[in-house]
C-alpha cells in the first residue's frame, strides 16, 4: 500500500509519429545508414532503433550525442495533450499534428493491453506561417439518458501563433475557428464542473480560458458545449446531404486586458470566489483608504493568477457583473476533405451569397472586440525571477509555480503568499493528485475518537504535488502543504508529465452524480519505452508519520515480507516472530494483507501456517465482539478450515492402504454389466487404441501425482457462506487438485470411503467432487489403461458420491433426465481422451443402472407387498430415460474411439517430400467436436488424416472392397492399373486397411466412399491453395474427384472448386500469357499467379482435367439419381456447418458450351506452358464474343461464337495447332537418336502427359480448323523425326491421302538428297550420274536441313516411297517422279545387300 507507478497504455508505433513531426530526424538516420554501409537497404521502416544506435560511438562524440539527444528528447519540443478519460492524445509541432486513439490489442506475449495507435495525422495550419502553440483534448458528455458514463466524443482545441483558436473532431475535421485576439495564443486551460465537497465551497462554472501576451479570454463552458454540439451535428448532416442550414448559438466570452505587468508566460483561472467580511474590509481599506464604503454583501469575483516577470506572480480580480459578456458569431470552418455541398451549407450559416463574395469574406479577418482593462491587484515582486508555469490544485486552494532559477514554489491562492519552496528542479514539470479516504480502512477501535464521530462521517481528501525533474530523470510525490516526500521513481530524462486539471465537459450537479467515468489525474509519457504511466498514491500517506498507525502497520508489513524471504534454520523462532508481527498490526485490512502474504509463502511448512492462523484466530475471538472486524474473523476461520482439510487429506494419502482382492476379467464383466463377448470387443478396441495412441507425455522425475503444496491448495479453494468452492483455475490446476484428492484412491492406495466422508464434511458439493474425479480420470488416460484395477476403484468412488445427499434428487423420476448423470455424460462428451471416456461411461452406466434398479425395486416391493414376486436380479435393468442416454453415449464414444485410433495410425510409406502442411498435427477428437462438426465432420476429419498420410485414392477403394470380399485375393481383380502402386505400398500400410475397414463399418453413411472422396478432394485443394507450389496436392485432388461415382456430387464439387480456388488464378494466368505473348518466366508467374512456372504448367493441366470432368458429369448426371445423404442413428443430433456434399448437391447445372469454351482456352494455355511456345497470344485466337464469355459463372448462359469464323482467325488457329503438334512430336521423339528408353519422353512434372496429337485434332474440331490438315501435319512430323512405324499407323486416320502423298514425296526427296548429295561418297556420286536428269534436278532442289532425323535406314525410306506410290493416283503429276524414286532407292540399297 505504498506509492506506485503503473503502466496502463502503450504506443503501437510512436516512431511513425516522430518521423511525421520531425522529418529531418528520419533523413539523418537514412544518411547515417548510407554512410555506414551503402549496400544496405535505405528503407527506414525496415530498420529498428537498435540498428541506428549500433554504430553511433564510431562517429565524432559531439555529433553522436546531439543525434542521440534529438532521437530521445524530441517529445520535449512538442505540444502534448491527453484527454483525462484516456480517449485521445494529441502530439503537435509547428503546423503538423498526430491524433492517437487507444485500441485493445494483444501484445507479443499474448496479453491483451491498450495501445495508442495513430488515428489521424496532418497539417492544422490554415494561414501561412502560423504554428501550434497549445492544445487541449476536452471530452464532452453524452446527452443520452442511457449513457454509461463514457464521453460522447472528444473535442481537440488548438491555439495558434496567429491568434486563432480552432476546434476539431477526433478525425481532424475542423468544426469552428475563432479569432478573439490578434496576438499569439500562449496557453489554453479548461475547467469542468465538480460537485462542491461541502456547503462552504463556491460552485464553479465550466469555462475555457485562453491566454494572450496581454489578455485573458474566458469562454463560458455551457455556451461552448452547445456550440460544439451544433457544429458537429451540422458537419455530419452536411457531409451526408449538403443542404441542412442551422445557425449555431453564439459563443459567450469575456476578454480582460491585463495591465501593470511586463510579461506573462502562464496563467491559472481560479474561478468565482467570495471574500470573508474581514478580507473585504482589508481590501476596501487598501484600495479606497480609511473612509472607504463597504457593501453589506461581499461581491463575487473571478480570480486569475499569472506568472511571468515584474511581478513574478500577479493576482487579478474581476468583479462579476461589472461587464456584459461579449457574443461571438460562430464562424464555422469546414475541413477541405468534405464535399462542396458542405461549403454551400457553411455559406448558408453565415448568410453568404456568391462564391466571389465568399472568398472575400474568408480573406477578411473577423472583427476583434477590444478588451476590458483589468489592473493587477497585487503580486509577488521579484525582479530577477521569471515564472515559467503555474499549476492549480484540484481543490483550487493551492498552486505550484516553476521558475527559471530551478525552484518550485507552493502558493496559497486565497492569501496570495508563498508557503513552501523546493530547490534544484530546473525545467521541472508539475501536476497534482487528489486522493479521497476510503471509510472502510479506518481503524474500528479509533472510530469513536475520530472528529467525525463515526465511521460513516464524510471522507477526507488529501492533495499531493507531483514533480518531474527531467535533468535528473526522477519523479517525486510530495504531501502538501508541509508534508514529506512520499514517493520517488527513476523514470528517465525524456518523459513528459501531463496534468489536464479537468474532467468531462457538459455535466451538472444532477448528471455528475450518476456518472463515475474512469479518469486519470496525471500521466507520464515515456517515449523511450513507448508507454504511458500513471501514479497511484494511497490516502494514508498524507497522514503525519509520527501519529499514523497505518505508517507503523506498513513498516511491520515490510518487516514481515523481509522475514518471509530469509532462510532461517530455526523455524520455531521465525514462527514466534511472525506471530508477534501480525498481532502488532492494528488495521484489519493490513492484518488481512499480512496473513495472505504468510499463507502464500513457499518457505514456511504446513505446521507453521496452521499455528500462526490458529493464534490469530484465538486472539480475535478473545477480543470484544464490537472491536473485531467481522471480515477478518471470517477470513481467518475460512483459511483455518482449508488448512484442516489439507491436513486430513494428506494424512489419508500417507496411510499404508492396499486392496488385496484379486481382480479378473469375469469380475470386470460383472462390474460393467457386460457379457463376455462385449467385454472382449471393448478390450480389443482399447488395445488397438493404446497401440496407435503413441503421444509422448513429458514427465519429470520429481513430478508426483497426488502431491500438492499447501500454498497452491489455498490458492485453488475458497469458502463462501460455509460452502467450499474452487476458484477459476486452469485445466492443469484443476487436474492437480483432483489428483490430490483422488489419485491414491483410484490406485487403491487410499481408503475411498474415508476420503469421500472427509471431503463431504468439509463442505465440497458432490457435483464439484464428481467434476474433480472425472477431470483426473480423463486426463490420466495412459496410466488408467495400463491398470485395469482402477476401473473397480472408480466404480466404488462413483457409487459413494452418488449416495451423498443432494447428489441424486430423491424425487427423480425414471422418465426424466437426472442432472447428476447428465453432468457425467457431458464430461465424457467433451473429453478428447476417448479411451478413458469410454471406460468412465461404462462405469457410469453400470452405477446408474444399479441405483435405478434399487430405486425401482423399493417402489416395486412397496407396491406388491405380501404377493409372490420374482426377485430382481442384477442382470435385469430398470428402463429409464437415463439408460437410453447412456446407451447412446456408449455408442458415440465407441465410434469416436475407433475414429481416433484410425487418425492416430501412421503408414510407413516413404514419400520423397513431406510438405510442412502435412507435418501439422491433427487435432484430437471428442464426441462434442463430432456433434458440432456438422454432417460432414466425420468425413472431414478422415480426409485431413488421408492428406497428412498422402494415401492414394486406391487405398480407400481397396479397404472399401474388402467389406464384401470373401477372400483377400478377390478385390484385387477389380482394381485398375494404378493398383501396382497400391500393392507396393500395401506391405507398409500395416493395420491401416483393417482400421479403415472398421471405420467404414462403424460409419456406413458418414464414410460412404463418394462422401469420403469428396471431402478428400476438397481438403487437398484447400491445402494446395495455401501453398500453390505443392502442385501434387492439386493433382491428388483431381484424382479423388475422378473417383467420385455419383455425377451430381462430382459436378457440384468440381464447380465449387472452380469458383472458389481456380477461376481467379486461371484468369490471371490467361492475361499474363496474353500480355507477354509466350510462355512466361518464373518471376512473372510468381508475381501475377502466385506460383512458379513449373507449378503453373501442372495447374493448367489439372484445370483441364477438372473441366473435362465437369462436362462428363453434366452428361451422365441425368442418368443417375440424386444421392440421399443419411446419418447413423447415433449421430442424428449433429449440428454445425453444412457439409461439402450437401453444398455440392445445391449447385446449379452448368452451361455445357461455356465449360467447353473454357476447356479449349485451358488446352491452349496448357500447350503453351507445356512446350514453352513463343509468339502466341491465347486470346487472339478468339473473337470478341469468345473473349467476353471467359471467366463468367459456368452456370450462366453466355453469348458464344457461332456460325462461320473469320478466315483470319482460322488461319492463326491452324498455325497454332500445327505448332503444338510439332512441339509434341519433338518432345516425344527428339531423344530416339540416343535410343534410351528412360529418356523417351519428357513427361509433365506431375502425373501422366496428355495425348497431344489427339488433343490437337479435338481442338481443331472446336476451333473450326480442318482436322485433316492437323492429321497430315502429324504424319509429316512423325516421318520427319524418322518414326516411320508410327507414321504408317497415323496415315490411316488421314482422309485426303493425295495431298499427304505429295507432302511425303517431298520428305522422301529430302532424305535421298541427304543420302546422295550431302554424304558425297564415291558410290553415291556414281549413282547420281546414272539417275534421270529430272530426278537429279528435283533432288538438288531439296533442302535436307529441314529433316529432324537424317539417319533413317534406306530400307525404311524404300517403304515410305512404296507407301507414296500406293497413295498417289496414277494420273497425278508427280506419279512419274515417284516411280523414278523407287528405282533410285532400289539402286542405293543394292550395294548394301
Swiss-Prot record:
Residue numbers bearing the Phosphothreonine modification: 901
Pfam families (UniProt xref): RAB3GAP2_C, RAB3GAP2_N
MF terms (GO), sorted A to Z: enzyme activator activity; enzyme regulator activity; GTPase activator activity; small GTPase binding
Tissue specificity remark: Ubiquitous.
Entry annotated with the keyword Phosphoprotein: yes
Organism whose genome encodes this protein: Homo sapiens (Human)
Alphabetical list of InterPro entries matching this protein: Rab3GAP2, RAB3GAP2_C, RAB3GAP_N
Keyword Endoplasmic reticulum: yes
Gene giving rise to this polypeptide: RAB3GAP2
Keywords, in A-Z order: Cataract, Cytoplasm, Disease variant, Endoplasmic reticulum, GTPase activation, Intellectual disability, Phosphoprotein
A GO BP annotation: positive regulation of endoplasmic reticulum tubular network organization
Name of the featured protein: Rab3 GTPase-activating protein non-catalytic subunit
Subunit structure: The Rab3 GTPase-activating complex is a heterodimer composed of RAB3GAP1 and RAB3GAP2. The Rab3 GTPase-activating complex interacts with DMXL2. Interacts with LMAN1.
Similarity-based family: Belongs to the Rab3-GAP regulatory subunit family.
Effect of substituting residue 426 to C: In MARTS1; abolishes GEF activity towards RAB18
Compositionally biased spans, kind Acidic residues: 44-64
Region Disordered, residue ranges: 36-67
Subcellular location: Cytoplasm; Endoplasmic reticulum
GO cellular component, one term: protein-containing complex
Associated clinical condition: Martsolf syndrome 1: An autosomal recessive disease characterized by congenital cataracts, intellectual disability, and hypogonadism. Warburg micro syndrome 2: A rare syndrome characterized by microcephaly, microphthalmia, microcornia, congenital cataracts, optic atrophy, cortical dysplasia, in particular corpus callosum hypoplasia, severe intellectual disability, spastic diplegia, and hypogonadism.
Modified residues (Phosphoserine): 39, 450, 916, 978
UniProt-listed PANTHER family: RAB3 GTPASE-ACTIVATING PROTEIN NON-CATALYTIC SUBUNIT (PTHR12472:SF0), RAB3-GAP REGULATORY DOMAIN (PTHR12472)
Functional description taken from the UniProt entry: Regulatory subunit of the Rab3 GTPase-activating (Rab3GAP) complex composed of RAB3GAP1 and RAB3GAP2, which has GTPase-activating protein (GAP) activity towards various Rab3 subfamily members (RAB3A, RAB3B, RAB3C and RAB3D), RAB5A and RAB43, and guanine nucleotide exchange factor (GEF) activity towards RAB18. As part of the Rab3GAP complex, acts as a GAP for Rab3 proteins by converting active RAB3-GTP to the inactive form RAB3-GDP. Rab3 proteins are involved in regulated exocytosis of neurotransmitters and hormones.
Amino acid at each position: 500500500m505504498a506509492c506506485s507507478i503503473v503502466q496502463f497504455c502503450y504506443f503501437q508505433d510512436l516512431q511513425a509519429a516522430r518521423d511525421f513531426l520531425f522529418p529531418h530526424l528520419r533523413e539523418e538516420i537514412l544518411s547515417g545508414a548510407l554512410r555506414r554501409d551503402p549496400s544496405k537497404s535505405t528503407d527506414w521502416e525496415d530498420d529498428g532503433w537498435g540498428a541506428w544506435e549500433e554504430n553511433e560511438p564510431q562517429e565524432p562524440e559531439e555529433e553522436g550525442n546531439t543525434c542521440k539527444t534529438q532521437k530521445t528528447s524530441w517529445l520535449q519540443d512538442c505540444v502534448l495533450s491527453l484527454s483525462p478519460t484516456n480517449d485521445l492524445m494529441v502530439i503537435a509541432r509547428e503546423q503538423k499534428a498526430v491524433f492517437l486513439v487507444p485500441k485493445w490489442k494483444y501484445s507479443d506475449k499474448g496479453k491483451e493491453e491498450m495501445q495508442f495507435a495513430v488515428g489521424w495525422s496532418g497539417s492544422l495550419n490554415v494561414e501561412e506561417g502560423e504554428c501550434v502553440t497549445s492544445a487541449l483534448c476536452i471530452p464532452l458528455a453524452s446527452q443520452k439518458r442511457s449513457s454509461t458514463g463514457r464521453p460522447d466524443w472528444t473535442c481537440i482545441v488548438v491555439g495558434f501563433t496567429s491568434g486563432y483558436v480552432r476546434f476539431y473532431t477526433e478525425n481532424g475535421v475542423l468544426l469552428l475557428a475563432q479569432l478573439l485576439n490578434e496576438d499569439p495564443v500562449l496557453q489554453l486551460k479548461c475547467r469542468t464542473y465538480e460537485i462542491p465537497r461541502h456547503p462552504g465551497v463556491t460552485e464553479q462554472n465550466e469555462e475555457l480560458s485562453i491566454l494572450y501576451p496581454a489578455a485573458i479570454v474566458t469562454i463560458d463552458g455551457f455556451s461552448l458545449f452547445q456550440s460544439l454540439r451544433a457544429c458537429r451535428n451540422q458537419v455530419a448532416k452536411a457531409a451526408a446531404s449538403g443542404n441542412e442550414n442551422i445557425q449555431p448559438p453564439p459563443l459567450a466570452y469575456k476578454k480582460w486586458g491585463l495591465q501593470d505587468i511586463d510579461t506573462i508566460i502562464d496563467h491559472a483561472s481560479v474561478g468565482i470566489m467570495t471574500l470573508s467580511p474581514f478580507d473585504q474590509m482589508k481590501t476596501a481599506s487598501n484600495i479606497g483608504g480609511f473612509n472607504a464604503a463597504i457593501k453589506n454583501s461581499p461581491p463575487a469575483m473571478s480570480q486569475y493568477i499569472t506568472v511571468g516577470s515584474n511581478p513574478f506572480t500577479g493576482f487579478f480580480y474581476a468583479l462579476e457583473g461589472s461587464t456584459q459578456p461579449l457574443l461571438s458569431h460562430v464562424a464555422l470552418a469546414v475541413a477541405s476533405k468534405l464535399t462542396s455541398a458542405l461549403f454551400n451549407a457553411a455559406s448558408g450559416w453565415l448568410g453568404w451569397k456568391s462564391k466571389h463574395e465568399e472568398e472575400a469574406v474568408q480573406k477578411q479577418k473577423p472583427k476583434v472586440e477590444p478588451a476590458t482593462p483589468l489592473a493587477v491587484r497585487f503580486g509577488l515582486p521579484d525582479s530577477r525571477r521569471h515564472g515559467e508555469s503555474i499549476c492549480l490544485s484540484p481543490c483550487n486552494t493551492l498552486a505550484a509555480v516553476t521558475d527559471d532559477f530551478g525552484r518550485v514554489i507552493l502558493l496559497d491562492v486565497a492569501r496570495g503568499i508563498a508557503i513552501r519552496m523546493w530547490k534544484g528542479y530546473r525545467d521541472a514539470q508539475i501536476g497534482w493528485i487528489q486522493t479521497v479516504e476510503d471509510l472502510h480502512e479506518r481503524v474500528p477501535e479509533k472510530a469513536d475518537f475520530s472528529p467525525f464521530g463515526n465511521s460513516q462521517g464524510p471522507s477526507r481528501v488529501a492533495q499531493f504535488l507531483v514533480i518531474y525533474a527531467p535533468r535528473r530523470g526522477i519523479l517525486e510525490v510530495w504531501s502538501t502543504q508541509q508534508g514529506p516526500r512520499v514517493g520517488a521513481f527513476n523514470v528517465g530524462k525524456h518523459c513528459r508529465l501531463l496534468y489536464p486539471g479537468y474532467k468531462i465537459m457538459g455535466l451538472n450537479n444532477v448528471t455528475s452524480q450518476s456518472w463515475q467515468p474512469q479518469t486519470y489525474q496525471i500521466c507520464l509519457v515515456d517515449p523511450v519505452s513507448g508507454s504511458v504511466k500513471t501514479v497511484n498514491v494511497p490516502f494514508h500517506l498524507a497522514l503525519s508519520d509520527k501519529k499514523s498507525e497505518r505508517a507503523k502497520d506498513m513498516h511491520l508489513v515490510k518487516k514481515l515480507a523481509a522475514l518471509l524471504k530469509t532462510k532461517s534454520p530455526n523455524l520455531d523462532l521465525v514462527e514466534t516472530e511472525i506471530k508477534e508481527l501480525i498481532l502488532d498490526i492494528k488495521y484489519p485490512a493490513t492484518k488481512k494483507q499480512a496473513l495472505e502474504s504468510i499463507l502464500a509463502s513457499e518457505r514456511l511448512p504446513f505446521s507453521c501456517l496452521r499455528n500462526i492462523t490458529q493464534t490469530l484466530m484465538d486472539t480475535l475471538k478473545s477480543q470484544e465482539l464490537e472491536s473485531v472486524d467481522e471480515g477478518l474473523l471470517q477470513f481467518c476461520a475460512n483459511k483455518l478450515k482449508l488448512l484442516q482439510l489439507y491436513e486430513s487429506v494428506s494424512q489419508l494419502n500417507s496411510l499404508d492402504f492396499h486392496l488385496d482382492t484379486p481382480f479378473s476379467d469375469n469380475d470386470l464383466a460383472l462390474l460393467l454389466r457386460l457379457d463376455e463377448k462385449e467385454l472382449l470387443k471393448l478390450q480389443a478396441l482399447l488395445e488397438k487404441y493404446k497401440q496407435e495412441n503413441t503421444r509422448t507425455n513429458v514427465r519429470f522425475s520429481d513430478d508426483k501425482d497426488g502431491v500438492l503444496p499447501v500454498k497452491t491448495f489455498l490458492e485453488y479453494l475458497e469458502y463462501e457462506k460455509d460452502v467450499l468452492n474452487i476458484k477459476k483455475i486452469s485445466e492443469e490446476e484443476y487436474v492437480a487438485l483432483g489428483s490430490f484428492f483422488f489419485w491414491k484412491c483410484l490406485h487403491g492406495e487410499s481408503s475411498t470411503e474415508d476420503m469421500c466422508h472427509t471431503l463431504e464434511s468439509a463442505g465440497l458439493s458432490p457435483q464439484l467432487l464428481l467434476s474433480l474425479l472425472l477431470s483426473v480420470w480423463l486426463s490420466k488416460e495412459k496410466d488408467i489403461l495400463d491398470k485395469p484395477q482402477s476401473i473397480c476403484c472408480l466404480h466404488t468412488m462413483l457409487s459413494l458420491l452418488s449416495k451423498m445427499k443432494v447428489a441424486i434428487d430423491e424425487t427423480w423420476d425414471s422418465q426424466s433426465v437426472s442432472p447428476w448423470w447428465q453432468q457425467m455424460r457431458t464430461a465424457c462428451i467433451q473429453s478428447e481422451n476417448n479411451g478413458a471416456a469410454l471406460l468412465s461411461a461404462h462405469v457410469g452406466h453400470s452405477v446408474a443402472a444399479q441405483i435405478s434398479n434399487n430405486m425401482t425395486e423399493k417402489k416395486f416391493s412397496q407396491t406388491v407387498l405380501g404377493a409372490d414376486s420374482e426377485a430382481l436380479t442384477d442382470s435385469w435393468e430398470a428402463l429409464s430415460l437415463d439408460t437410453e442416454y447412456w446407451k447412446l453415449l456408449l455408442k458415440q464414444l465407441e465410434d469416436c474411439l475407433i475414429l481416433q485410433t484410425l487418425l492416430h495410425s501412421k503408414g510407413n510409406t516413404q514419400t520423397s517430400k513431406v510438405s510442412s502442411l502435412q507435418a501439422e498435427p491433427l487435432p484430437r477428437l471428442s464426441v462434442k467436436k463430432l456433434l458440432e462438426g456438422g454432417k460432414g465432420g466425420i468425413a472431414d476429419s478422415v480426409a485431413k488424416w488421408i492428406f497428412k498420410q498422402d494415401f492414394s485414392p486406391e487405398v480407400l477403394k481397396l479397404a472399401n472392397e474388402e467389406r464384401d470380399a470373401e477372400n483377400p485375393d478377390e478385390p484385387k481383380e477389380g482394381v485398375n492399373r494404378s493398383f501396382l502402386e497400391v500393392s507396393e505400398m500395401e506391405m507398409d500400410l500395416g493395420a491401416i486397411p483393417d482400421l479403415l475397414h472398421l471405420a467404414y463399418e462403424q460409419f456406413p453413411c458418414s464414410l460412404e466412399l463418394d462422401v469420403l472422396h469428396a471431402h478428400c478432394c476438397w481438403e487437398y485443394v484447400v491445402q494446395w491453395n495455401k501453398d500453390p507450389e505443392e502442385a501434387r496436392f492439386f493433382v491428388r485432388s483431381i484424382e479423388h474427384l475422378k473417383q467420385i461415382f455419383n455425377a451430381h456430387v462430382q459436378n457440384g464439387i468440381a464447380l465449387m472448386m472452380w469458383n472458389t480456388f481456380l477461376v481467379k488464378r486461371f484468369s490471371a494466368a490467361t492475361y499474363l500469357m496474353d500480355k507477354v505473348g509466350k510462355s512466361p518466366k518464373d518471376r512473372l508467374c510468381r508475381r501475377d499467379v502466385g506460383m512458379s512456372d513449373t507449378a503453373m504448367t501442372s495447374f493448367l493441366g489439372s484445370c483441364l482435367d477438372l473441366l473435362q470432368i465437369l462436362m462428363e458429369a453434366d452428361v451422365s448426371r441425368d442418368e443417375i439419381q440424386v444421392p440421399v445423404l443419411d446419418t447413423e442413428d447415433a449421430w442424428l443430433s449433429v449440428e454445425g456447418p453444412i457439409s461439402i456434399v450437401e453444398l455440392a448437391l445445391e449447385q446449379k447445372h452448368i452451361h455445357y458450351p461455356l465449360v467447353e469454351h473454357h476447356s479449349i482456352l485451358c488446352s491452349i494455355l496448357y500447350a503453351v506452358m507445356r512446350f514453352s511456345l513463343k509468339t502466341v497470344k491465347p486470346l487472339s485466337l478468339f473473337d470478341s464474343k469468345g473473349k467476353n464469355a471467359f471467366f463468367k459463372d459456368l452456370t450462366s448462359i453466355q453469348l458464344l461464337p457461332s456460325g462461320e469464323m473469320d478466315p483470319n482467325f482460322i488461319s492463326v488457329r491452324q498455325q497454332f495447332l500445327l505448332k503444338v503438334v510439332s512441339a509434341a512430336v519433338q518432345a516425344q521423339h527428339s531423344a530416339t537418336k540416343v535410343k534410351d528408353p528412360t529418356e523417351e519422353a519428357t513427361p509433365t512434372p506431375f502425373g501422366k502427359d496428355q495425348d497431344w496429337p489427339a488433343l490437337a485434332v479435338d481442338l481443331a474440331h472446336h476451333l473450326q480448323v480442318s482436322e485433316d490438315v492437323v492429321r497430315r501435319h502429324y504424319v509429316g512430323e512423325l516421318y520427319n523425326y524418322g518414326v516411320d512405324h508410327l507414321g504408317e499407323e497415323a496415315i490411316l486416320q488421314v482422309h485426303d491421302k493425295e495431298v499427304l502423298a505429295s507432302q511425303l514425296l517431298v520428305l522422301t526427296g529430302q532424305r535421298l538428297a541427304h543420302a546422295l548429295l550431302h554424304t558425297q561418297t564415291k558410290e553415291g556420286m556414281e549413282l547420281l550420274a546414272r539417275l534421270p536428269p529430272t530426278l537429279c534436278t528435283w533432288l538438288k532442289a531439296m533442302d535436307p536441313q529441314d529433316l529432324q532425323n537424317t539417319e533413317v535406314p534406306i530400307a525404311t525410306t524404300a517403304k515410305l516411297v512404296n507407301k507414296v506410290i500406293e497413295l498417289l493416283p496414277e494420273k497425278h503429276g508427280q506419279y512419274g517422279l515417284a516411280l523414278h524414286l523407287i528405282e533410285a532407292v532400289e539402286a542405293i540399297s543394292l550395294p548394301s545387300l
